[in-house]
Amino acid sequence: MSRADEIFIQNCKDILTNGTWDTDREVRPKWDDGTPAHTVKKFGVVNRYDLSKEFPILTLRRTYWKSAVDELLWIWQKKSNNVHDLRSHIWDAWADENGSIGKAYGYQVGVKHHYPQGDMDQIDKVLWDLKHNPASRRIMTNLYTFADLSEMALYPCAYSMTYNVTGNKLNAILNQRSQDMLAANNWNVVQYSVLVMMIAQVSGLVPGELVHVIADAHIYDRHVPFVEEIIQNEPRPAPKFTLDPNVDDFYKFTLDSFTMEGYQYSDFSGKIPVAE
């Protein structure tokens, strides 16, 4: 069993057994038919993934890792807020007629800020600090800009990363305000694991731990049967995920720079509804 499978099963069982339902109050999300999308949740879930040991991708069901990485590059490398720059259509529901999601995600990454070393955006400052001041305890990014929230199609769910160099390892903490466990949990874990691996490689470091801190880890009411089915599936060993070792520039990574070997997963044919 992969560590990602083990953590997912533990989280979901805990939420379903010990979680709190919000059926006693009004909620913002709705299903396609207009019905309120209620959830059962746990507060303050913390998961640790040791990237030096294995790549944390689910085998209980397939995670479309190439689409997840494409979205990662869209945000952190292209710094785009336009869905036309994405291969998938995941974000289409939140885009305007021009394909924009407003001042969200990639837009925030690309905003330049003034530092003593010069003007840099968030990811470039991380890369600069890791090269020139790896002992710093101030290496972080934050996409939750209050002044711009009114111009975002969707408030950032995974919103901040804190990077820390310990020895020759790059560790990171991902803070997430809200997590749809079925639809997006492993998607986000895969993305930010890859981001840590990319940054580590171009900074002359090796990947360490990704610590995922989730404020509100929830399962939607209509997702419960799917979750109950998936956590009963047969888990398999974690596959091997590698980056092209010749890439030494963060902006030179492409989808072809990543390889997954031996990825086996259980079949799952359910059509998962998404609340908006």
State where each predicted segment sits.
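Terminal, non-catalytic protein-protein interaction segments that mediate quaternary/complex assembly
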Residues: 1-276
